[in-house]
């Protein structure tokens, strides 16, 4: 299977750099998912807009991460499990 590598920050489009800096500021690092989406700044923007919209729902951060962990488990996504385990720990 072909893999798309994460872009080093310096190689990302200027339009994506501001968004990636916001992610770095919020999380303390830039997860590979976002660095990979930066290949297509419109995809990164769309993903972040969706995440932001879902974050405004009635579920708190802890409940959202429980759902994300369950979904990751069902889908067999080891990367997603690792990422959402980290975010679940941060959410409490």
Label each residue range with its predicted role.
Residues 1-92:
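Hydrophobic alpha-helical segments
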């Amino acid at each position: 299977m072909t893999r798309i590598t994460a872009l080093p920050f310096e190689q990302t489009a200027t339009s994506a750099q501001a968004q990636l800096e916001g992610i770095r500021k919020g999380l303390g690092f830039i997860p590979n998912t976002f660095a990979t989406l930066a290949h297509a700044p419109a995809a990164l923007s769309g993903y972040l807009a969706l995440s932001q919209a879902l974050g405004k729902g009635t579920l708190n951060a802890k409940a959202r991460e429980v759902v994300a962990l369950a979904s990751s488990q069902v889908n067999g996504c080891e990367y997603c499990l690792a990422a959402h385990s980290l975010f679940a720990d941060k959410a409490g």
